[in-house]
A protein has these predicted regions:
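Glycine-biased, small-residue-rich flexible motifs in mid-sequence functional cores and linkers
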Residues: 2-147
Length: 147
């Protein structure tokens, strides 16, 4: 799946307006696919990687309902709740976006590559403040959570 990676800097056209009020947001974002439009309604659904089947089903259900009603779903592409939220959004025929703790050229965990591919094919995107090639190091994930 080849898809161009682009960079958008804070204060530049295309940088998410909703992040501008926060001083600790990244100075630049690396993007593969698309970013949600500033006028797009969004909701973040995140949770544990190790979770119950009930938790996964509820995350998927809420994401599907949100997506079916025009709300883009944002999560982290991790196993568990995050992946269920992305799957639900796709079932709801909506867009879904992932904020990564690694470079946008890396799918972590690797088992979610088919999910990431479908997200991109359906008009969503993946974004990160970490440059392409950045490995998914443990301390990257708390940093990315602020986005």
């Amino acid at each position: 799946m080849a898809m161009e990676i682009f960079t958008v800097g804070r204060g530049q056209e295309g940088y998410p307006e909703r992040l501008m009020p926060f001083a600790d947001m990244p100075s630049r974002l690396f993007v593969r696919g698309a970013l949600p439009a500033d006028e797009q309604k969004t909701a973040a659904i995140v949770g544990a990687r190790i979770c119950t089947a009930y938790g996964k089903s509820q995350a998927a259900f809420f994401a599907q309902v949100l997506a079916a009603n025009g709300v883009a779903v944002i999560s982290g592409l991790a196993c568990g709740i995050d992946a269920a939220a992305h799957e639900g959004a796709l079932r709801g025929k909506g867009k879904t976006f992932a904020v990564l703790g690694c470079g946008v050229d890396i799918c972590y965990p690797k088992q979610n590559y088919p999910l990431m591919r479908r997200m991109l094919e359906n008009g969503g995107g993946v974004l990160s403040e970490f440059p392409p090639g950045a490995e998914p190091l443990p301390w990257h994930f708390p940093i990315r959570n602020r986005v």
